[in-house]
Amino acid sequence: MKFHNYWELVLGNKTKIKVLRTLFRYAGKRFSVRELAHLSGIAHPPVLRSLADLEGMNLVRKEKHGPANVITLNRKSNLYLPLSALFLWEKEAKEKLIQRLTVLLPPVKMAVLFGSVQTGSEEIGSDIDILLVTANKRKIQDQLSEVRFKITEEFGNFFSPIVLTEHQFKKAKKRPYALTLARNYKVISGSDLIKTWWKQ
């Protein structure tokens, strides 16, 4: 392996990052190159090219198993711990957002995360969609400006809350966004009023 300026070689393109993400997700698993390519969502040839560099950096081991090569993550590699921490941080990114929202949001009847961030289909510029149900809509709206500033400052995404009274929430059951929301959401605080009022 190299000992200086090696991150370009390890993480230098999307293919390598996707391959490493798969290897760390299934640490200990033995892969054929074809299986590794399939799980990583990448074509076979670029995976082969990436594996040559990763093997050279002592991150993967390649063994002959009959006519095929078997790939395993080298968990004794000097680079295993920093990369493990990197992918763990990525895996927990949404949970860190939820933890911050739990701290920052004012007390409400219900706060839920929904939309692309919840489903995992977000893009770089996607909004953070939050639904809040409260007895005092105006008071909560006034308190959200500081939350919006802090969330955007920390995560870079625009904070996009929908604030409803309990009466408005009950009436919103058949709106298009409500039908989508009810299929995939995460309760941040308060009670699950979606299950109580929308799914009756």
Label each PLM-derived region with a short phrase.
Residues 1-107, 119-125, 134-200:
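Catalytic core of pol beta-like nucleotidyltransferases
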